[in-house]
């Protein structure tokens, strides 16, 4: 069995892998960091097209971490790398919002900073609304990031690279405002990752060696104080390299996007029927909130206490009308929709179910999450 590595050694290996070994996303050995995301709205595609090619080519994320309703928000991007997602978000939050990117790899931070003036000029902003910091995502206080200072934290295939996941999530909880959200894509394992996989430098750099057992996410989130994780999308990860495939054995991996909300400590919310008013840009007809709930404009949907609390206490509150479920007519046969609805929380099940629905031959240009040019 390979000897385990300490945290400092892992950090140095990750810095070397992303700062020196990888030059473009084409150098990746697995599809862990280029898996598909959910369909991208046109306004986000347009924002992606405004990002400089040099920045996009150094992007190694595992999805597209752009949540909804971003105008005027303060957003923190953990492991911002070359700054691709930051520059997309910069356009979406607008001049009154702000985006901060933090990354431990100085080479990547310098790439992001190099193109700051270019992007602000392209977006037509009088003053920069993006800041890039060099630091560790599990030590945000050391980088000067204040408590309860952000509406949203995003992370794109990065938390798995850090040995202490709980410390990362604890710091995220600290810097989020009440009602704030961590919206993040990451890699998860089907079982506790064996030591020989954890000790493999390439597999760790490829986001597999440090992957969290998917069931542990809910345990850590509850311990810290987050609401239960809400699964959004999931895709099975494939490994084309035979040597790496042999090391992985029976351990399977999935790229998944989750939402974690930090809510104020108030009395539990009641079950409700909610009606979406269609007020969110790019999602006027329907809001796909997660794998379990899609809200169509003007249509009443029964939600559980947890979902009601999230919608009422987050930035989404103005977009919904809430009615206590008892005030509505009972569902047929005396059972409510909530009693018959089975919530999907297992990313492997969601990925497998999604694969069954996909065409056998994908259309040209849909490789990875963003097609051949990684520009969605």
Swiss-Prot record:
Molecular-function annotations in GO: arsenite methyltransferase activity
Region (Disordered): 354-376
Basic and acidic residues composition bias: residue spans: 354-363
One CC-aspect GO term: cytosol
E.C. designation(s): 2.1.1.137
Catalytic activity: arsenic triglutathione + [thioredoxin]-dithiol + S-adenosyl-L-methionine + 2 H2O = methylarsonous acid + [thioredoxin]-disulfide + 3 glutathione + S-adenosyl-L-homocysteine + H(+); arsenic triglutathione + 2 [thioredoxin]-dithiol + 2 S-adenosyl-L-methionine + H2O = dimethylarsinous acid + 2 [thioredoxin]-disulfide + 3 glutathione + 2 S-adenosyl-L-homocysteine + 2 H(+); arsenic triglutathione + 3 [thioredoxin]-dithiol + 3 S-adenosyl-L-methionine = trimethylarsine + 3 [thioredoxin]-disulfide + 3 glutathione + 3 S-adenosyl-L-homocysteine + 3 H(+)
Location within or outside the cell: Cytoplasm, Cytosol
Gene Ontology biological process terms in this record: arsonoacetate metabolic process; methylation; response to arsenic-containing substance; toxin metabolic process
Modified residues (Phosphoserine): 47, 336
Main location: cytoplasm
Keywords on record: Cytoplasm, Methyltransferase, Phosphoprotein, S-adenosyl-L-methionine, Transferase
Enzyme class name: transferase
Family under the similarity heading: Belongs to the methyltransferase superfamily. Arsenite methyltransferase family.
Role noted for this protein: Catalyzes the transfer of a methyl group from AdoMet to trivalent arsenicals producing methylated and dimethylated arsenicals. It methylates arsenite to form methylarsonate, Me-AsO(3)H(2), which is reduced by methylarsonate reductase to methylarsonite, Me-As(OH)2. Methylarsonite is also a substrate and it is converted into the much less toxic compound dimethylarsinate (cacodylate), Me(2)As(O)-OH.
Protein name (Swiss-Prot/TrEMBL): Arsenite methyltransferase
Natural source organism: Mus musculus (Mouse)
């Amino acid at each position: 069995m390979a000897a385990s590595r300490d945290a400092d050694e892992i950090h140095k290996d990750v810095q070397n892998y992303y700062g020196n070994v990888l030059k473009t996303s084409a150098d990746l050995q697995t599809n862990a960091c280029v898996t598909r995301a959910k369909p991208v709205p046109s306004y986000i595609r347009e924002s992606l097209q405004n990002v400089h090619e040099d920045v996009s080519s150094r992007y190694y994320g595992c999805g597209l971490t752009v949540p909804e309703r971003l105008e005027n928000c303060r957003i923190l991007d953990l492991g911002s790398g070359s700054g691709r997602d930051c520059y997309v978000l910069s356009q979406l939050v607008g001049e009154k919002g702000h985006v901060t990117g933090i990354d431990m790899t100085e080479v990547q931070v310098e790439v992001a900073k190099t193109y700051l003036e270019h992007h602000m000029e392209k977006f037509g902003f009088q003053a920069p609304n993006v800041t890039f910091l060099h630091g560790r995502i599990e030590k945000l206080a050391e980088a000067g990031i204040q408590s309860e200072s952000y509406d949203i934290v995003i992370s794109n295939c990065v938390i798995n690279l850090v040995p202490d996941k709980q410390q990362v999530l604890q710091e995220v909880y600290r810097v989020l405002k009440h009602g704030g959200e961590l919206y993040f894509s990451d890699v998860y394992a089907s079982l506790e990752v064996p030591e020989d996989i954890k000790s493999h430098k390439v597999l760790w750099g490829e986001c597999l060696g440090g992957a969290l057992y998917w069931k542990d996410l809910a345990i850590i989130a509850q311990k810290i104080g987050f609401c239960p994780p809400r699964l959004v999308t999931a895709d099975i990860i494939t490994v084309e390299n035979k040597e790496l495939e042999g090391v992985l054995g029976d351990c399977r991996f999935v790229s998944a996007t989750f939402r974690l909300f930090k809510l104020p400590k108030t009395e539990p919310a009641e079950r409700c029927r909610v009606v979406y008013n269609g007020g969110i840009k790019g999602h006027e007809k329907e809001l796909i909130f997660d794998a379990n709930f899609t809200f169509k404009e003007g249509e009443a949907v029964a939600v559980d206490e947890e979902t009601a609390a999230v919608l009422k206490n987050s930035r989404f509150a103005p977009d919904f009308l809430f009615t206590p479920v008892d005030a509505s007519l009972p569902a047929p046969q005396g059972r409510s929709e909530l009693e018959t609805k089975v919530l999907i929380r297992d990313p492997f099940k969601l990925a497998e179910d999604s694969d069954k629905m996909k065409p056998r031959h994908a259309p040209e240009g849909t490789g990875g999450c963003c097609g051949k040019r990684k520009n969605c």
